[in-house]
Amino acid sequence: MSQRTRLSVNVNKIAVLRNSRGHGAPDVIRAASACIDAGAHGITVHPRPDARHIRHDDVIGLSTLTRARGVEFNIEGNPFAEPRAGYCGLLALCRETRPHQVTLVPDGDQQITSDHGFDFAREGPGLRPLIDEIKQWGCRVSLFVDVNVTGLADAAIWGVDRIELYTGPYAEMHHAGCSDAVLREFATTARLAQDVGLGVNAGHDLSQTNLGVFLGAVPDVLEVSIGHALISEALYEGLIPTVRRYLDILDSVNPAVSMR
């Protein structure tokens, strides 16, 4: 069975806008539902310990929505961030909701956004038991990684299903008009992952401007997770039309790719 690269819409920024006024508008669940209406294949959230955007009740509501609508739910986050008041911890959230995919990300509490991937040599021993636990819940496990990451074969042995390529460096180079070299590095990393049986996702600073070029150069990307750019563009174009524009890019660039 095969499919084109899938689009998972990150709705964190909807929650940022809602939280800025302290009430329920805009409604995160309604926004996610609109994205699904437009054809999005999944919804992504990245809850933070400080609840700066997505909150526990959002995760529960989105889990219910995605299962009812038959699309994937992807929860991202740092598995090493300690639980605290208002945040039960990433693993507890995933245990409760059993998302289709859990993407582990090594971000610190004070980071504005994710900006690097895991160092497998240093962090692998801590990740392995967490991967085992998450897999027991029936969730697919993806690890957020930098281009040129080493240790992909080890990740496959640990039971990791996919990696998510951190595409921030590509977006910067594309904006500067000099992305050819870094695209070759991303393509090489993707092939190395696929050679050891890992599926490849991608995300961070992807936009309508740079997505097509990336997918044209990097082979067999299974899923892109896009939030900030998509929500920003939707302010001008509308949410449903914007999601459809991204789907048009996926359809125009990608032949069908094998699912892993």
UniProtKB/Swiss-Prot annotation:
Family: Belongs to the PNP synthase family.
Entry-linked PANTHER family: PYRIDOXINE 5'-PHOSPHATE SYNTHASE
Protein name: Pyridoxine 5'-phosphate synthase
Subcellular location: Cytoplasm
Binding-site list for 1-deoxy-D-xylulose 5-phosphate: R48, H53, T113
HAMAP family: PdxJ (MF_00279)
Known EC number: 2.6.99.2
NCBIfam families: pdxJ, PRK05265.1-4
Keywords for the protein's UniProt record, in alphabetical order: Cytoplasm, Pyridoxine biosynthesis, Transferase
Catalytic residues, chain numbering: H46, E76, H204
Binding site for 3-amino-2-oxopropyl phosphate: N10, R21, D205, G227, H228
Substrates-to-products reaction catalysed: 3-amino-2-oxopropyl phosphate + 1-deoxy-D-xylulose 5-phosphate = pyridoxine 5'-phosphate + phosphate + 2 H2O + H(+)
